[in-house]
Every structure is written in C-alpha cells, then in structure tokens.
Amino acid sequence: MQHAAVPDSLVHEWAESIVGDQYPVPDRILHFTEILVQDYLSQEMCDNRPPRGAYDLFATEGGTAAMCYIFDSLQENFLLNKGDGIVLMVPAFTPYIEIPQLSRYQFRVTKIHANRMNNEGMHLWQYSDEDIDRLKSPKIKALFVTNPSNPPSYTLSPDTMARIVSIVRNDNPNLMIITDDVYGTFSPHFRSFMAEIPYNTLCG
C-alpha cells in the first residue's frame, strides 16, 4: 500500500518519536505511524480484506497492560459492571483467568474449554457447538478469546468463527468480543474477529 506524505512532516514526526521530547495530546498513536499500523493490521489480521473504514487504535506498553486498561475502561464506561456475565475461552493467557476474579470486577465467569478430540483421542483444541451456543444468552455481556490459543497455538476453526459471528449478528448483537490475536501473524491467511464483526470487537 502506498500513501502520500509531506516529507518534512514525516521526518519531523520520526525525529520527535526518536527523541521522545513530548507526548501527543490527546494520547494517541502519531499520525504517520498510525497509517502504517492500519495497513499492517489490514494485512495481518484481515488477510488483506479489511472492513470499510479505519480502526480506532490505542497503543500500550504491553499485552498485560492492555488487558488492565481494557477491563478498567469497560467498567468505567459502564459497558461491564460488577456481577455481569462473561465467557472466557480456555486455555487462555493467565491474566485473563486471574483479572476477572479481582474484587474490583467480580464478573460471573463462564469458562468454555477447547476439549474436542479426534477419533484417535488426540486433542483438536477446538470448542463444541453446544458451548459456543451459550453465547446466545443476553446475560453474557462479553467474550474473551485468545486466537490462536495460548499455549496450544491453534486458531479457531472456520466453523466456530462463523458460528460466533452468526450469534452476534442474529442472537446477541450487544455481545462484546475481546480477542487477543498476538499470534495471528503465525497463521497463514489469518482473519480476526475484527475483520468480520469490527463493531463488536476489541482486538489486542
């Protein structure tokens, strides 16, 4: 992808980024950097088939920090409240399991497990349709998923992805999906939920 830029403005932004002599106000990714990140996400998270429009981006100092900000922001903006029901797809990165249990959140956590097996008794690291269908309940406010999974490193099957997308579109349109796609770049032709249902998705 190609973008036009005023050379002096581009070099000025890069120089300020390297020197670190000021913070952007309001907090945000710098202009030209954001353009590059948008293209990168379209390529790596959307298989070069992004939805129309641009993503709202916010950079953090790391993945765990991002999770803390996400939980706090959802609660401070009354999108999630104490006692709300959330679904956690496991296995998952440990902070996803521990953070919702803190007294400041007290979410009602339902874990669904990637326990499907093949005919030889080997783990497929995939989820049953019955468990996925639990997301149809309006009592479930948010779904937390690591895709590809951590530590098994398996992506959600196309059937499971399609089933969740269908549930959001037809059964639970207010369901928020918080997806950690940090290992998506290792999966050829990977497509995140942010590519399929961007309005409902927060991707970290």
Language-model features: locations:
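Walker B catalytic acidic pair
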Residues: 181
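Residue-level marker for buried hydrophobic side chains located in beta-strands
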Residues: 177-178
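N-terminal low-complexity, Ser/Thr- and acidic-residue-enriched intrinsically disordered segments
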Residues: 1-2
